[in-house]
Design a protein with these regions (language model features):
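Helix-loop junctions at the membrane-solvent interface of multi-pass transporters
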Residues: 25, 42-49, 100, 161
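A feature for the membrane-embedded catalytic helix bundles of lipid/isoprenoid biosynthetic enzymes
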Residues: 2-18, 87-232
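Ser/Thr-centric signal marking residues that sit
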Residues: 29-32, 179
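Membrane interfacial helix-start motif at the N-side
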Residues: 21-26, 82
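Membrane-embedded alpha-helical segments that form the functional core of polytopic membrane enzymes
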Residues: 32-81, 113-122, 166-175
Length: 232
């Protein structure tokens, strides 16, 4: 929800900072790596029970996550490779943060509550996969109640007010499940209505090319056999 409505606005507002970092010699990949390192530190701190410090590190983790795109645009190095690295780092950051929460619960809350952040992580990965797969099919799966920005904000509230952490995790789980259903339904409708999508046209073109190549190979084979059969 916030990713779709505000991400482009935030990116544009951070372009001047991205230019300054580029002039200082900072690359977008370096910013992304810093974000991963900070997420790993936050994971350890949360796992050890320092939730307020974990909250601070979680907030700081959002800084490089917001800046890597503007730095890439300012330096003119925005590329599929960078987009891939950024997407992978986002999933890794999610796993580190929720893994830290699971570690904390394993040591302080006996029972099955440790599975709560694990379930949230599974749903967050499913939500991300839905978008990636939909985009590979030239469909749109953006949107939903609990996108990545919302997960960051709600988890930060849970770390800041530790007595409400379990309630916050349940809220994240429910909203993530709703988001997964929303995205599934959205893509399902598009796939049902759009009979001639760019993906389908490319797939048809690939099939046509395969048929043409097989026909060419057969023609070459027939021509070669005719040459071999000629009397010398």
């Amino acid at each position: 929800m916030l990713d779709g409505n505000w991400r482009s606005v935030v990116d544009r507002s951070l372009i001047p900072i991205g230019r300054s970092l580029h002039r200082a010699g900072v690359t977008a990949d370096a910013v992304t790596v810093v974000g991963i390192i900070m997420a790993a530190g936050a994971s350890v701190v949360i796992g050890l029970g320092y939730l307020r410090l974990g909250f601070a590190l979680l907030v700081l983790t959002g800084v490089p996550d917001a800046l890597d795109g503007p730095v890439a645009k300012a330096s003119g190095t925005a590329s599929p490779r960078g987009a891939f690295f950024d997407s992978v780092s986002d999933r890794l950051t999610d796993a580190l943060l929720l893994g830290g929460v699971a570690w904390y619960l394993a040591g302080t809350r006996p029972g099955h509550l440790v599975m709560l952040p694990v379930a949230v992580l599974v749903l967050s990965l499913l939500i991300s996969y839905q978008r990636a797969k939909a985009e590979s099919l030239d469909l749109n799966a953006k949107g939903g109640l609990m996108e990545r920005a919302e997960r960051f904000i709600v988890l930060a509230i849970g770390l800041l007010f530790s007595e409400a952490l379990i309630v916050v995790l349940w809220l994240m789980l429910v909203l993530s499940a709703i988001t997964a259903v929303q995205r599934f339904a959205k893509v399902w409708r598009q796939a049902s209505l759009e009979r001639d999508t760019p993906y389908q046209r490319r797939a048809a073109r690939r099939r046509q090319l395969r048929v043409e190549r097989r026909a060419e190979r057969r023609q070459r084979l027939v021509a070669r056999r005719r040459v071999e059969r000629r009397p010398r």
